């Protein structure tokens, strides 16, 4: 029974080996045509432009001046605080690196 099992296993492996060899695709040496690349580029560009236009329309439709003013104020306050804390942190790092004199 061991011999039959080995013979069946060898036959299965042989068949699988031939199947794998037959499934290989030939290598294509030709490059994609420039016309195809330009078509893809043009279609992606048109999709991008339409998405930008839709986003701009949505922004204009939902624009609220009060919210815009609050966001600008929040941004200016947060950047001022960040610059202050960045300066403090930089001074601390420099004093640690420099050491005590």
UniProtKB/Swiss-Prot annotation:
Region entry Lipoprotein lipase cofactor, spans: 78-101
Cross-referenced InterPro entries: Apo-CII (IPR008019), ApoC-II_dom_sf (IPR023121)
Record key words, sorted: Chylomicron, Glycoprotein, HDL, LDL, Lipid degradation, Lipid metabolism, Lipid transport, Secreted, Sialic acid, Signal, Transport, VLDL
Propeptide residue span(s): 23-28
Domain of life where this protein originates: Eukaryota
Protein's cellular compartments: Secreted
Protein name: Apolipoprotein C-II
Species whose genome carries this gene: Papio anubis
Higher taxonomy: Eukaryota, Metazoa, Chordata, Craniata, Vertebrata
Gene name as annotated: APOC2
């Amino acid at each position: 029974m061991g011999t039959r099992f080995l013979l069946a296993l060898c036959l299965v492996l042989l068949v699988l080996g031939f199947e794998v060899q037959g499934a290989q695709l030939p290598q294509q040496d030709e490059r994609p045509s420039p016309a195809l690349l330009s078509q893809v580029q043009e279609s992606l560009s048109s999709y991008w432009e339409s998405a930008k236009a839709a986003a701009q329309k949505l922004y204009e439709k939902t624009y609220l001046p009060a919210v815009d003013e609050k966001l600008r104020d929040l941004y200016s306050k947060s950047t001022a605080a960040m610059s202050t804390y960045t300066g403090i942190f930089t001074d601390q790092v420099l004093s640690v690196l420099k050491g005590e004199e």
